[in-house]
C-alpha cells in the first residue's frame, strides 16, 4: 500500500549577519505546497546580500506510527512544516576532484509535519527549523489525523492514600 504523500518545494534564505563571527545566516523561509518540479536548486531572489533559493522535489509522507506527532502539530496554535537541513560547501565549477570550495549553502534534506520526528532530529544534533504550514497541507494532515489517530486511553492512578500500606512503595 502506498503511503499518503504531498509534493513540496522548500525555499531557503541567505541573509547577511551582523555578527562578528558569522558573515551570513541561512534558514528555511517557506514551503510551496503541491510543487511538482524537480531538479537543481535555483536562485529566486537576490537583493542587497539576501538570496532565496528554491529546492524542489520533496515528498511529504505520512506514516501511521507518527499520527500522534501530526495531531500535536495540527492542534498547536501555529502548525509548522519542519525542515531538516544542513550547510554544504558550494562546489566550484569544473573541479574534477569534487573538492568543495567557496561559501556554504543551506540545503534542505527532509521535511515532516510530525512534532515527534522533528524532536528526534533535534535530539540528534541536526538543524531543524519550522516554517508556516500551508493551508492545503494543514487540511490534508488534519484529515489524515482524523482517520488514523486514536489517543491512548488514560489509566487512572490511585492516590497513595487509597493504596494498601503493604503495597506502597517508598
Q: Where are the predicted features?
A:
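Terminal targeting/leader modules
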Residues: 1-135, 149-170
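Amphipathic alpha-helical interface segments used for dimerization/assembly
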Residues: 137-149
Amino acid at each position: 500500500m502506498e503511503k499518503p504523500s504531498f509534493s513540496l518545494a522548500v525555499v531557503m534564505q541567505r541573509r547577511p549577519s551582523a555578527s562578528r563571527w558569522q558573515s551570513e545566516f541561512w534558514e528555511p523561509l517557506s514551503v510551496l505546497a503541491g510543487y511538482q518540479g524537480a531538479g537543481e536548486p535555483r536562485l529566486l531572489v537576490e537583493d542587497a546580500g539576501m538570496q532565496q533559493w528554491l529546492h524542489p522535489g520533496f515528498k511529504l509522507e505520512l506514516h501511521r506510527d507518527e499520527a500522534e506527532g501530526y495531531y500535536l502539530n495540527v492542534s498547536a496554535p501555529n502548525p509548522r512544516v519542519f525542515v531538516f537541513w544542513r550547510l554544504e560547501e558550494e562546489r566550484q565549477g569544473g573541479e574534477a576532484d569534487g573538492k568543495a570550495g567557496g561559501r556554504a549553502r543551506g540545503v534542505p534534506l527532509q521535511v515532516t509535519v510530525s512534532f515527534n520526528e522533528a524532536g528526534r532530529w533535534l535530539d540528534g544534533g541536526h538543524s531543524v527549523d519550522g516554517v508556516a504550514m500551508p493551508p492545503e497541507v494543514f487540511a490534508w494532515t488534519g484529515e489524515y489525523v482524523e482517520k488514523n489517530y486514536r489517543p491512548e486511553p488514560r489509566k487512572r492512578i490511585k492516590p497513595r492514600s487509597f493504596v494498601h500500606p503493604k503495597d506502597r512503595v517508598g
